[in-house]
Design a protein with these regions (language model features):
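Short beta-strand micro-motifs in enzyme catalytic cores
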Residues: 43-47, 70, 133-137
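A short, internal acetyl-CoA/4′-phosphopantetheine-binding micro-motif in the GNAT/acyltransferase core
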Residues: 72-80
Length: 153
């Protein structure tokens, strides 16, 4: 399977981004709609992944100007650590281009081991958000600049 990853503005790609996030976050994770679709989407840099054969959206992610990475969603039939790593690589590259000092995200506890392979470190206390135990994880941009991420596919 081949796919394309693009940076997209919310204004042009909102229906495609929303379709993935609705299926993953609202239907599967039972995140309330008003939590999933906040007022930060317009200011974020968004990633959209589409299946090259069907042209359908299959994954999303976003980074805010303050360095917060969030809304990483991959449709169930397309889930693989490889795809999530590629989404993260594009988001981290965007962070470098935004000249951020660090990035952070509020990860589910079960995902922290995976994100540690992307140079993230857990900080602070565990808390509940939308019924999921989470913890803040951070990554200094210097470690991203020195990491070797391949964006080929």
């Amino acid at each position: 399977m081949s796919y394309s990853i693009c940076l997209v503005p919310w204004e042009q790609a909102a229906p495609l981004l929303m379709s993935v996030r609705e299926k993953v976050s609202i239907c599967e994770r039972r995140t309330p709609r008003k939590v999933e679709f906040d007022n930060k989407d317009k200011e974020a840099v968004h990633i959209l992944v589409c299946d090259d054969d069907t042209k359908e959206p299959i994954a999303t992610g976003r980074i805010l100007p303050n360095g917060e990475i969030s809304r990483i969603s991959v449709l169930k039939p397309y889930r693989s650590l490889d795809l999530v790593k590629r989404v993260m690589a594009v988001l981290l590259k965007a962070a470098v281009e935004l000249k951020l000092d660090k990035v952070y995200m509020y990860s589910s506890l079960s995902s922290i081991p995976f994100f540690s392979t992307c140079h993230f470190t857990a900080v602070g206390s565990v808390f509940m958000k939308s019924g999921i135990p989470r913890q803040c994880i951070t990554c200094p941009i210097d470690s991203i600049k020195h990491a070797h991420y391949q964006l080929t596919h």
